[in-house]
Curated annotation (Swiss-Prot):
InterPro entries listed in its UniProt record: Palmitoyltrfase_DHHC (IPR001594), PFA4/ZDH16/20/ERF2-like (IPR039859)
Enzyme class: transferase
Organism: Arabidopsis thaliana (Mouse-ear cress)
PROSITE patterns with a match to the protein in the record: DHHC
Its membrane topology: Multi-pass membrane protein
Protein's name according to its UniProt entry: Probable protein S-acyltransferase 12
Any Pfam family matching the protein: DHHC
Superkingdom of the source species: Eukaryota
Keywords: Acyltransferase, Cell membrane, Lipoprotein, Membrane, Palmitate, Transferase, Transmembrane, Transmembrane helix
Domain DHHC residue range list: 111-161
Length: 291
């Protein structure tokens, strides 16, 4: 029985996950901005509190814009597949047999995909959901209906980063309402439905904060060692992973060298032209830079 044929169903699930992301954003927006801080701001009868409301609303919208920008860039960016010119240059895999590899100079050790029946560059893996080989594949993410690979890994990390900050902000500003829900004040509340929506938003954001914290820590560790989620199982206890070039170079392979672009879900033209790893075909190893 081929279980991989059911993987295509994950794509259908992914479209519902996009709607779920939009729904959570909508609930959070209503709870934080519409119900809580916007009324305080427009009343303007509390100097310090109004200033705090303005600050919270500004930060909330800034993080929301960066979150959605990073998210949809990740969704709509091709993670990278083996280009046709690469297959032609490498002979289409005719010289390779299934399960073998060979050294091809600048491209390092090439592999062979038994499903695509073609040659593949280093760090490239076959995705059973997308039905193709993905360059520097990290994993297939149902939340974005896409693979995370060489060309959208930075955008995915920024999506995690901004989502974590946004949900953390929501948890902090909604905490008083959550506490109020369990106090005697709920019995005297003129709008229990509004209070319930605030509590729902708090619970959802708190759950996301906990899960995202684990995910962010994991990917910081992977980024610092220049490792993907797939490659964690390939390292086989190596003292030093062959693609680990040091934390600075590892970071630049994903985020580029232009600091002004590090927190934006896009690359500078110089980085695209000069960093081969962003194309997902060539990756220097530690033996290339060690004296």
């Amino acid at each position: 029985m081929n279980l991989f044929r059911f993987c295509s169903g994950l794509k259908v699930l992914g479209y519902f996950m996009i709607l779920l992301v939009v729904a959570v954003v909508g609930v959070s927006y209503y709870a934080v901005v519409v119900s809580t801080w916007w009324p305080i701001l427009i009343r303007g009868d509390h100097g310090a509190l109004s200033a705090l409301a303005a600050l919270i609303i500004f930060v909330f919208h800034f993080l929301l814009i960066m979150l959605l920008w990073s998210y949809f860039t990740t969704v709509f960016t091709d993670p990278g597949s083996v280009p046709e010119h690469f297959r032609r240059e490498m002979g289409g895999g005719d010289s390779l047999e299934a399960g073998t590899s060979t050294d091809q100079g600048a491209f390092g050790s090439l592999g062979y995909c038994t499903k695509c029946r073609n040659v593949k560059p280093p760090r490239c893996h076959h995705c059973s959901v997308c039905q193709r080989c993905v360059l520097k594949m990290d994993h297939h993410c149902v939340w974005i209906v896409n693979c995370v690979g060489a060309r959208n890994y930075k955008f995915f990390l920024l999506f995690l980063f901004y989502t974590f900050l946004e949900t953390m902000l929501d948890v902090i500003v909604l905490l008083p309402s959550f506490i109020e829900f369990f106090s005697q004040a709920i019995k005297h509340s003129s709008s229990p439905g509004k209070l319930a929506s605030l509590v729902l938003a708090f619970v959802l954001n708190f759950a996301f904060v906990l899960s995202l914290l684990c995910f962010v820590v994991m990917h910081i560790s992977l980024l610092s060692s220049n490792t993907t989620s797939v490659e964690v199982h390939e390292k086989n206890g190596e003292v030093r992973w062959k693609y680990d070039l040091g934390k600075k170079k590892n970071f630049e392979q994903v985020f580029g060298k232009k600091k002004a672009f590090w927190l934006l879900p896009l690359y500078s033209k110089d980085d695209i032209d000069n960093i081969t790893s962003l194309e997902g075909l060539e990756f220097p190893t530690c033996s290339d830079i060690d004296p």
